Amino acid sequence: MEEEIKSLINVGFLTIISVSYCYCLPPRIKSGVLRLLSIFPVCVLLVVLPLFFSFSIFTSTTAFFLSAIANSRLILFSFDQGPLFPLPSNLFRFTCFTCFPIQRQQNPKSQDHLSTYVFPVKIAIFVVLLYVHNDIQNLPRTFLLCLHPLYVYLLLEILLTLLRILMTIILGCDLEPHFHEPYLATSLQDFWGRRWNLIVSASLRAIVYTPVRRVCQRVMSSDYAMLIGVFATFVTSGVAHEVVFFYITRAMPTGEVALFFLLHGVCTVAEVAAKRTAFVRRWPVRPVVSWMFTIAFVNVTAGWLFFPQLIRNNLGERCSNEISLLIDFFRSKLFYFPQ
């Protein structure tokens, strides 16, 4: 346990030094390839930092916050794009917008009242699922595979929403939500583009989709360029998730996670193309029907391709044990009274 805490301190120190460098020197360099080259060593370091840990909770958090979020924002910053442009007023704000999955709200007046009222219900459901966790393990495997997406969604929504509330108080500005009720999605395009993990979607849109579409438009029609941009985004997301899963499990990639995103990429492209046909425009699918098919497809494919690798490596049990060790460690340090 002490080694993990030491690694946490070292990673924190290296991150602060690296981000401070990015705040001070690269902005003095003209945006473009030269600024990207000046930031490149930091990007490499941020990719390596998750390997400092053996605990999966530290590894996954570092991989998401630093290897994914921070790297994508520094790359965009190299070209005067993203949340870091224009340059934040001080180093603290620059560090927060670099390392945390937060983004200034474009339209602060638009408040999602549904999410505000439903959030306590989500917490209650998650607490109930945790309480009955041991009792439902004997249920059919098919039913459990359907519960895994619910577990992951509620966990991410609760943690990231609490982080957003905290950072809103600290920074004094309205921040974008991370999710927009993904269980209400009526299509794959709606699910991935407008409801699921919106902060990551915005980064992928800026780094992958927009450049690929712009390049492809030079040699083909705008519609085909758009479809290629969508598929390229899913390919990139699949590769990134394979890397994150390697960080967490420390097992050789199986390709299942990448296949999950490739499948969703192909189906999303087909869906977008179908919506543009005269047949679908004339006879549109009823929203309730498309909602049922979308949710069923996401859950079935996630249970088939996304979660098996995590289940085989006992990620849930590992996280529970790690949290118990952390609680015991801090309890012994905080409530230790020498004789």
UniProtKB/Swiss-Prot annotation:
A biological-process GO annotation: lipid metabolic process
Reaction(s) this enzyme catalyzes, per UniProt: a long chain fatty alcohol + a fatty acyl-CoA = a wax ester + CoA
First-level EC class: transferase
Lipid metabolism found in the keyword field: yes
EC numbers, comma separated: 2.3.1.75
GO cellular component terms listed in the entry, alphabetical order: membrane
Sorted UniProt keywords: Acyltransferase, Lipid biosynthesis, Lipid metabolism, Membrane, Transferase, Transmembrane, Transmembrane helix
Stored InterPro entries: Wax_synthase, Wax_synthase_dom, Wax_synthase_Magnoliopsida
Membrane topology qualifier: Multi-pass membrane protein
Localization in the cell: Membrane
TM ranges: 7-27, 39-59, 113-133, 143-163, 226-246, 254-274, 287-307
Functional summary from the UniProt entry: Catalyzes the final step in the synthesis of long-chain linear esters (waxes).
Protein name, as recorded: Probable long-chain-alcohol O-fatty-acyltransferase 7
Source species of the chain: Arabidopsis thaliana
